[in-house]
Amino acid sequence: MQVKETVADGLKREFQVNVPAADIDAKIDEKLADLKDKVRLNGFRPGKVPTAHLKRVYGRSVAAETIDKLVRDTNDGIFSERGFRLATEPKITMPQDQKEIEDILEGKSDLTYTVAIEVVPAIELADFKSFSVEKPVVDVADSDVDEAIKRIADANRAYADKAEGAKAETGDRVTVSFKGTIDGVAFDGGTGEDIPVVIGSASFIPGFEDQLVGIAVGETRTIKVTFPANYASETLAGKPAEFETTATKLEAPQETTIDDEFAKTLGLESLDKLKEAAKARLGAEYAGASRLKVKRQLLDRLDEAHKFDAPPSLIEQEFEVMWRSINAEMQSTGKTFADENTTEDAAKEEYRKIADRRVRLGLVLSEIGEKNKIQVTDDEVSRAVIERARQMPGREKEVWDFYRSNPEALAQLRAPIYEDKVVDFILELANVTEKKVTREELYKDEDDKTAA
């Protein structure tokens, strides 16, 4: 067998491989000899079928199967001998001429093919002990706990009927029945009976709640609204609609006394226990936000310390995934590049940079995990599946069965677990210092991004 490297351009490699007909024939004979003791043919005793007869009956299929395995094994040998880690699947170009193919299958001609690959570059890892990371820490203040409990109280507020003839005000709960039309035609999902609406809660289409102000029980109004451009239903998105709406009940919010009795309505023993639960929940939220900031800093350090040319095909794949998502979002919201103060070309350039960073960081994290034998256990994946199932009450078995029968979805759960374990490994080595910050400072970056 002869192997000739024909392309060595950056991370791209191409080889021309020649496999002698004699080698192919020998492999085919080995396969036929193995079949000899397994096949059953009329007129022959088990194990006594002549090889020549087997070749006539199974020759072409055995030859095709043998060549396929021979090519795969040969390629694996080429890559392992040179220490290549493949970025993508090899691109194999086999002979196309029909006569040449026939000659190869019949053992009359050598097999010559080409295999093109893109390799992962060698990565020299940084000294993680030189990394410095600042961990923001927020103490849960009593005022934070009080605010959290007030939000809970507001969400569980009681309502009482307003006096006969009273008009609806912001904050009131109005029970309505409505029939919606677009251009005079009813549409799916446009009808509702006895639906409670809290005016000012922003839980309905923009403009709907505002037009309920001043309505009385028994009164019917035509409410005119326009569905948002990013509305979930594409058939309704951006369209004007009218709802013939009748108020059937009107209630005013009642003051909620935050005491032991209120805590008991939530299943807790006392107000002190409610405060403890609220404080623990806030602490977990702050810890999660702090973790995200630490991780972002660490990824920035990894990015700065590992500059290399990533495989172009992986960058292109990552870019295509992001770009499809961007286009889908723009179509659903109706936004344009001009709305974002940019152009399509400028946006593409920016997202290609992001794709490059993501690919490089992915390769670096993979290298760290591999060199330090970091693995994700089956128990860790199972816990992730259970957590996902808990998020969908009543559909737990459906979620469990989905992941059991869908390896790709399971891999998507495994990936972030692996990444977090690698991050934890680096943090054990890095110099991490804590810094006391306020709640506002902790969430500042996220608020700025939302505003942008």
Curated annotation (Swiss-Prot):
Domain of life: Bacteria
Location of the protein in the cell: Cytoplasm
A biological process term (GO) from this entry: cell division
Primary subcellular site in the record, as a coarse category: cytoplasm
Chain ranges of the PPIase FKBP-type domain: 171-256
Assigned EC number: 5.2.1.8
Identification of the protein by name: Trigger factor
Gene label: tig
Protein task: Involved in protein export. Acts as a chaperone by maintaining the newly synthesized protein in an open conformation. Functions as a peptidyl-prolyl cis-trans isomerase.
PROSITE patterns: FKBP_PPIASE
Sorted UniProt keywords: Cell cycle, Cell division, Chaperone, Cytoplasm, Isomerase, Rotamase
UniProt key word Zinc-finger: no
Domain commentary: Consists of 3 domains; the N-terminus binds the ribosome, the middle domain has PPIase activity, while the C-terminus has intrinsic chaperone activity on its own.
Organism of origin: Rhodopseudomonas palustris (strain TIE-1)
HAMAP family xrefs: Trigger_factor_Tig (MF_00303)
Top enzyme class: isomerase
Gene Ontology MF, one: protein folding chaperone
Catalytic activity: [protein]-peptidylproline (omega=180) = [protein]-peptidylproline (omega=0)
